[in-house]
Design a protein with these regions (language model features):
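Active-site residues of response regulator receiver
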Residues: 74
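Acidic catalytic/metal-coordinating carboxylates
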Residues: 55, 81-84
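Acidic, metal-coordinating helix/loop segments flanking the phosphotransfer/catalytic sites
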Residues: 52-70
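Conserved acidic carboxylate
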Residues: 30
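The feature encodes the CheY-like receiver
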Residues: 78
Length: 138
């Protein structure tokens, strides 16, 4: 299956968004616990339900067991990368959007649907998440 990779800005420029139902479940994967709490808080304030994982193995377990609408993952994780995790998760549920984020742009995005810089504004970050969820009809 071929996926078109887009930057966060391209996603929001290519898709008008309206309100997203407030029951969407996002899996946030980050090994930095302070950053994980920050992302979780921002998403929950927007009405999303958020599950968290600090390792690729933990994310894989949650992804298999829960009806996740979108995965948001750091690129550099202990023991794996976001690119490797995207490949594993897309093998299980290819329709679930996978957003890779990092402080630096990775050379390879693999199966990730979109890349977001950690420097992205909160408003832009949330707009990208909303756009991807709406686009994938979840």
């Amino acid at each position: 299956m071929s996926h078109k990779r887009e930057s966060g800005r391209q996603v929001t420029e290519n898709l008008r968004t309206g309100p997203v139902p407030r029951t969407k479940l996002i899996l946030c994967v980050e090994d930095n616990k302070a950053y994980l709490r920050l992302r979780k808080t921002v998403l929950e304030r927007e009405g999303y339900s958020v599950l968290t994982a600090t390792t690729g193995a933990e994310a894989l377990k949650v992804f298999r067991e829960e009806p996740v609408s979108l995965v948001l993952s750091d690129h550099m994780l202990r023991g794996t990368t976001g690119v490797a995790l995207a490949h594993q998760l897309k093998t299980i549920k290819p329709h679930v959007p996978f957003v890779l984020y990092s402080g630096t742009v990775p050379d390879i995005m693999g199966d990730a649907d979109c890349f977001i810089s950690k420097d992205e504004t909160v408003a832009s970050f949330l707009s990208i998440i909303k756009s991807l969820i709406k686009r994938h009809g979840e």
